[in-house]
Design a protein with these regions (language model features):
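Substrate-binding/active-site clefts of carbohydrate-active enzymes
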Residues: 20-22, 26-74, 80-194, 214-223
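Active-site-proximal helices and loops of the catalytic beta/alpha 8
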Residues: 25-28, 120, 192, 202-287, ...
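Short, solvent-exposed turn/loop segments enriched in Gly/Ser/Thr/Pro and often Arg
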Residues: 77-91, 132-141, 202-208, 231-236, ...
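Active-site clefts of carbohydrate-active enzymes
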Residues: 279-302
Length: 453
């Protein structure tokens, strides 16, 4: 859903005023996730089915699977595949996140057999499948509003409440245990009946941790290696069973660095904060764009314009403790916002960034130094206001990343003698000798070196 970051706290107050059964999540929980092994060196590619092809169907999207496999994509996350409510609908097609039926398929995309065939095709190519889930609210004409009105938070007039400007939705009440059980049953359906590999959870930050401590183990009982990604960055999510979270503060710092508003070393303060407030096993999902940022905030073409995209994309693909995300069309690249409530197909023709992403994603899949649990170490390679450098290391493998996060050419030199010697320049595909000799890195430049291969 569209992020109104400054209003998150306000939203909790509004809902609290509307009902005594607030959905405000507790901050004190105890259990942690055991990550599925397949995500540790994996990556995520977000699919906007409506806009991905002219047809906007599962069957049409299937024609892109070979291309995505070739690009190194490992996990495909589909935005909500459920039917969209018609009541209070926004635009002609409505928001993907106004769900009318938790166990139904949006007929615009196809039918259940089409979906099952697509999941099988993805699995047959060795890739994983995530679907978007919207537990915080339903669409404005979801059947539960008639059959189970007690499932919903009420406003001051006794009607099912809404949040922010999401007038096409109605907020669910997580103090209702029957609703919780119904939600878990619906989520389990997609696991047991269609074989998905996990969930990206919308507005996870407004759902209580106690629910996730109940829900996630119940789903993992059906399939033990499920992956759970929370849209949110509240620490309680990472101690309630989620594997990964949205690192919004890091993303916003990246945008400021790209705009020249903050120095490159500003990224360090966010990394230090994450290290202090999250369990060490928590996985941030780094990105330069996603469906919200593209539609509402001009990412990545506006936030990381032109050549600025590349070093920040390298950052997202190689940063410590993380899993990277690529959004539909970034490989083209997509240089416009996709409307949220109307049809506007992506045209794939140039694929100018496909080889770039392939290099990064294949490196991550094949080199355990980029595993989510590999060691991260910041190193000095130049003026730290502009040059950001670090190593990743695990199992005798080492990766060195050097980024020029500025619009000016920067001198680069290494001082750490442990980095001297032969290394493979990943993007040039050649062996080089690294030493204390300085060189110039072009504006928005980047270099990735692999040792011990």
């Amino acid at each position: 859903m569209k992020k109104w970051f400054l209003l998150i706290f306000v939203s909790a107050l509004i809902i609290s005023c509307k009902s005594k059964t607030s959905t405000t999540a507790p901050d004190t929980v105890t259990n942690t996730a055991t990550h599925p092994g397949w995500i540790m060196q994996g990556n995520i590619y977000e699919v906007n089915t409506r806009q991905y092809t002219k047809e906007g169907t599962f069957n049409a999207f299937a024609g892109h699977l070979d291309r995505l496999k070739e690009m190194g994509v490992q996990t495909i996350w589909f935005m909500p595949i459920n039917p969209i409510s018609k009541k209070d609908r926004k635009g002609s097609l409505g928001s993907y996140y106004a769900v009318a039926d938790y166990t139904g398929i949006n007929p615009e995309y196809g039918n259940l057999d089409d979906w099952k065939n697509l999941v099988k095709a993805i699995h047959d190519k060795g890739m994983k499948v995530l679907i978007d889930w919207v537990p915080n609210h339903t669409g404005a004409d979801h059947p539960w509003l008639q059959t189970h009105p007690g499932f919903f938070i009420k406003d001051s007039t006794g009607q099912a409440a809404t949040m922010f400007d999401w007038t096409d939705t109605r907020v669910l009440d997580f103090k209702n245990n029957e609703m919780q059980d119904s939600m878990i049953a619906a989520m389990k359906y997609w696991v047991t009946e269609t074989g998905i590999d996990g969930y990206r959870v919308d507005v996870a930050w407004n759902v209580p941790g106690d629910f996730w401590k109940k829900c996630i183990p119940a789903l993992k009982a059906a399939k033990s290696d499920l992956f759970f990604l929370a849209e949110g960055d509240k620490p309680y999510l990472m101690t309630s069973g989620f594997d990964a979270f949205y690192p919004w503060e890091m993303f916003h710092m990246m945008v400021k660095v790209a705009a020249g508003e903050r120095p490159a070393f500003g990224l360090d303060s966010i990394k230090a904060k994450y290290d202090s407030v999250y369990p060490k096993e928590a996985i941030p999902m780094y990105f330069t764009s996603n469906h919200d940022e593209n539609s509402w905030n001009k990412s990545d073409y506006g936030t990381f314009p032109g050549a600025a995209h590349a070093p920040f994309a390298v950052f997202t693909q190689t940063m410590g403790s993380s899993v990277p995300l690529v959004y539909s069309g970034q490989e083209e690249p997509l240089l416009r916002p996709l409307p949220f409530f109307e049809k506007d197909s992506i045209v794939f023709s140039k694929l100018e960034r496909a080889a770039f992403y392939k290099t990064l994603q294949e490196l991550r899949k094949n080199n355990e130094a980029l595993s989510a649990d590999a060691v991260f170490k910041k190193v000095k390679a130049g003026d730290e206001k502009s040059v950001y450098a670090y190593t990743r290391e695990k199992g005798g493998k080492k990766i060195l990343v050097i980024l020029n996060l500025s619009k000016k050419e920067q001198p680069v030199s290494l001082t750490d003698q442990s980095l001297f010697g032969k290394a493979n320049n990943v993007f040039k595909g050649q062996s080089e000798t690294l030493n204390a000799t300085a060189w110039k890195m072009e504006p928005w430049g980047y270099a990735v070196f692999s040792y011990n291969n």
